[in-house]
Amino acid sequence: MALKSYKPTTPGQRGLVLIDRSELWKGRPVKSLTEGLTKNGGRNNTGRITMRRKGGGAKRLYRIVDFKRTKFDVSATVERIEYDPNRTAFIALIKYEDGEQAYILAPQRLAVGDKVIAGAKVDVKPGNAMPFSGMPIGTIVHNVELKPGKGGQIARSAGTYAQFVGRDGGYAQIRLSSGELRLVRQECMATIGAVSNSDHSNQNFGKAGRNRHKGIRPSVRGVAMNPIDHPHGGGEGRTSGGRHPVTPWGKGTKGTRTRSNKSTDKYILRSRHAKKKGR
């Protein structure tokens, strides 16, 4: 899908660049594949804000997307490509030969009428899914499982992909778009191709209201707050803060590493930080 820019007929149109979604399905989603979605405004079950800058926005229906692809050796036809408000990628409605319908993440170059299939060893075509054990090395994949049978967790957002670069014992080596080199079990499933809507990051919404429609609220700078609200707050006039930039809870906010999951460190062969200068 291409980008669409607008003439500056109003201040909100000036600089506006959106994805051209004219080729997507214009009707409602399949009702049996949707669920209601309750807004929580970034609050948890105790009512406290656990995710800042969230709230409001247009009402959404949740589309049930098949991230597992466990229906092996049954061919399916792509009925249509749809917009999904709950993710940055587009989704594809597929219909299996036995009549069952499902939503999957739409990869790039997947078109209406194409056939897709999941199995132990299938053709290397966008939309087909198989475990790494039957996949040729060098394949570009998305929707990668971290645990066999759990469903894809890696490379699901618009334009992302991982590359299958080698085998190591019972593990597959994959290179992620962040530069990280990581091991996953060879029984883990992955879908061929890169995720659709790669131009998503090149959009310019033109006005604050478009972000509000998406449920994104304004982000207030720490230096504009009072000392009670933020470590950067307070001071007469504009102040530099006098310390390294931190979050409201005092953790470094510009690249300080806070990852503490040591049990899975052994699966990371090369850190995503390794390519950075001086590290």
UniProtKB/Swiss-Prot annotation:
<dbReference type="GO" id="GO:0015934">
    <property type="term" value="C:large ribosomal subunit"/>
</dbReference>
<dbReference type="GO" id="GO:0002181">
    <property type="term" value="P:cytoplasmic translation"/>
</dbReference>
<dbReference type="Pfam" id="PF00181">
    <property type="entry name" value="Ribosomal_L2"/>
</dbReference>
<dbReference type="InterPro" id="IPR002171">
    <property type="entry name" value="Ribosomal_uL2"/>
</dbReference>
<comment type="function">
    <text>One of the primary rRNA binding proteins. Required for association of the 30S and 50S subunits to form the 70S ribosome, for tRNA binding and peptide bond formation. It has been suggested to have peptidyltransferase activity; this is somewhat controversial. Makes several contacts with the 16S rRNA in the 70S ribosome.</text>
</comment>
<keyword id="KW-0687">Ribonucleoprotein</keyword>
<feature type="compositionally biased region" description="Basic residues">
    <location>
        <begin position="269"/>
        <end position="279"/>
    </location>
</feature>
<dbReference type="InterPro" id="IPR005880">
    <property type="entry name" value="Ribosomal_uL2_bac/org-type"/>
</dbReference>
<keyword id="KW-0689">Ribosomal protein</keyword>
<dbReference type="Pfam" id="PF03947">
    <property type="entry name" value="Ribosomal_L2_C"/>
</dbReference>
<dbReference type="GO" id="GO:0019843">
    <property type="term" value="F:rRNA binding"/>
</dbReference>
<dbReference type="GO" id="GO:0016740">
    <property type="term" value="F:transferase activity"/>
</dbReference>
<dbReference type="InterPro" id="IPR012340">
    <property type="entry name" value="NA-bd_OB-fold"/>
</dbReference>
<comment type="subunit">
    <text>Part of the 50S ribosomal subunit. Forms a bridge to the 30S subunit in the 70S ribosome.</text>
</comment>
<comment type="similarity">
    <text>Belongs to the universal ribosomal protein uL2 family.</text>
</comment>
<keyword id="KW-0699">rRNA-binding</keyword>
<feature type="region of interest" description="Disordered">
    <location>
        <begin position="223"/>
        <end position="279"/>
    </location>
</feature>
<dbReference type="InterPro" id="IPR014726">
    <property type="entry name" value="Ribosomal_uL2_dom3"/>
</dbReference>
<dbReference type="InterPro" id="IPR022669">
    <property type="entry name" value="Ribosomal_uL2_C"/>
</dbReference>
<dbReference type="GO" id="GO:0003735">
    <property type="term" value="F:structural constituent of ribosome"/>
</dbReference>
<dbReference type="InterPro" id="IPR014722">
    <property type="entry name" value="Rib_uL2_dom2"/>
</dbReference>
<dbReference type="InterPro" id="IPR022666">
    <property type="entry name" value="Ribosomal_uL2_RNA-bd_dom"/>
</dbReference>
<protein>
    <recommendedName>
        <fullName>Large ribosomal subunit protein uL2</fullName>
    </recommendedName>
</protein>
<keyword id="KW-0694">RNA-binding</keyword>
<dbReference type="InterPro" id="IPR022671">
    <property type="entry name" value="Ribosomal_uL2_CS"/>
</dbReference>
<dbReference type="InterPro" id="IPR008991">
    <property type="entry name" value="Translation_prot_SH3-like_sf"/>
</dbReference>
